[in-house]
Amino acid sequence: MTRVKRGYIARKRRKKILAFVSGSRGAHSKLFRTANQRKARALVSAHRDRGKRKRDLRRLWITRINAAARANGVSYNRFIQYLYKRQLLPNRKTLAQIAVLDSNCFSTIFNNLSYDEIG
């Protein structure tokens, strides 16, 4: 059987993985086997946390809108319900930014909804 020397291809593959985990501590950045496991774990965490970030930001936006709505005397739930009944589909990210950066504008939006005729 002919001898196969993998030469630079194997070295290139290992270097790529070691470069990926270069920020790790100890053997995880030096030894190929542990580095390979660390890379797999990092990719799993990155994939999971991309979804988690979306959930966390939505929770933050809802909290901010709730605080601003309660400052005007209505809960978040009622405020969103009124928006839907007026067929104003809320973008929570934008509403949260308005609530934080320009509370007068949020109050204007809030006061333009007539709560009596809906509820």
From Swiss-Prot:
<dbReference type="GO" id="GO:0000027">
    <property type="term" value="P:ribosomal large subunit assembly"/>
</dbReference>
<dbReference type="InterPro" id="IPR049946">
    <property type="entry name" value="RIBOSOMAL_L20_CS"/>
</dbReference>
<keyword id="KW-0699">rRNA-binding</keyword>
<dbReference type="InterPro" id="IPR005813">
    <property type="entry name" value="Ribosomal_bL20"/>
</dbReference>
<dbReference type="GO" id="GO:0003735">
    <property type="term" value="F:structural constituent of ribosome"/>
</dbReference>
<keyword id="KW-0150">Chloroplast</keyword>
<keyword id="KW-0934">Plastid</keyword>
<dbReference type="GO" id="GO:0019843">
    <property type="term" value="F:rRNA binding"/>
</dbReference>
<dbReference type="GO" id="GO:0006412">
    <property type="term" value="P:translation"/>
</dbReference>
<dbReference type="GO" id="GO:0009507">
    <property type="term" value="C:chloroplast"/>
</dbReference>
<dbReference type="Pfam" id="PF00453">
    <property type="entry name" value="Ribosomal_L20"/>
</dbReference>
<dbReference type="GO" id="GO:1990904">
    <property type="term" value="C:ribonucleoprotein complex"/>
</dbReference>
<keyword id="KW-0694">RNA-binding</keyword>
<protein>
    <recommendedName>
        <fullName>Large ribosomal subunit protein bL20c</fullName>
    </recommendedName>
</protein>
<comment type="function">
    <text>Binds directly to 23S ribosomal RNA and is necessary for the in vitro assembly process of the 50S ribosomal subunit. It is not involved in the protein synthesizing functions of that subunit.</text>
</comment>
<dbReference type="GO" id="GO:0005840">
    <property type="term" value="C:ribosome"/>
</dbReference>
<dbReference type="InterPro" id="IPR035566">
    <property type="entry name" value="Ribosomal_protein_bL20_C"/>
</dbReference>
<comment type="similarity">
    <text>Belongs to the bacterial ribosomal protein bL20 family.</text>
</comment>
<keyword id="KW-0689">Ribosomal protein</keyword>
<keyword id="KW-0687">Ribonucleoprotein</keyword>
